[in-house]
Amino acid sequence: MHELSIACEIFEQVKVTAEAHGATEVKHVTLQMGRLSHTNPEQLSFCFKTLAEGSIAENADLIVEMVPPTLECECGYTGTIDQERIRESNELTSELLAYIAAMDCPVCGKQAHIAGGRELIIKSIEIETENENESQR
């Protein structure tokens, strides 16, 4: 379960960032997670909430925005992969990965390569500070 080690890194970054900005509470953490990151959002959320117990992030909502895989080709084409095929499977099976890896460019027909969809980025951390009664990002 590599979600635990990922959650540890996210929690540490959230904690350091929140403390650096004088936070009294972390309200929301928004992540951008690539569909090809091999990370289970539910397991990641569970691990994060477990790590956050007793901290300023204890009540934080972990919001995961899924990022679709994208292709690039040497001809200049950039685009997303057919989402219908990906939605059919909740898991990244070897068959689905083989399909994605072998995709041809819809413009020139050459084999394209995966350019995005593997990322895991902290997009935003919404905090509350003692000096302000309103939240800030």
Curated annotation (Swiss-Prot):
GO terms for molecular function: nickel cation binding; zinc ion binding. Pfam families: HypA (PF01155). The keyword Repeat does not apply. One of its GO terms (biological process) is protein maturation. Keywords: Metal-binding, Nickel, Zinc. Zn(2+) binds at C73, C75, C105, C108. PROSITE patterns: HYPA. Ni(2+) binds at H2. InterPro entries: Hydgase_Ni_incorp_HypA/HybF_CS, HypA/HybF. Involved in the maturation of [NiFe] hydrogenases. Required for nickel insertion into the metal center of the hydrogenase. HAMAP family: HypA_HybF. NCBIfam families: hypA, PRK00762.1. Belongs to the HypA/HybF family. PANTHER family: HYDROGENASE MATURATION FACTOR HYPA. This is Hydrogenase maturation factor HypA. It comes from Methanosarcina mazei (strain ATCC BAA-159 / DSM 3647 / Goe1 / Go1 / JCM 11833 / OCM 88). The lineage of its organism: Archaea, Methanobacteriati, Methanobacteriota, Stenosarchaea group, Methanomicrobia. The gene is hypA.
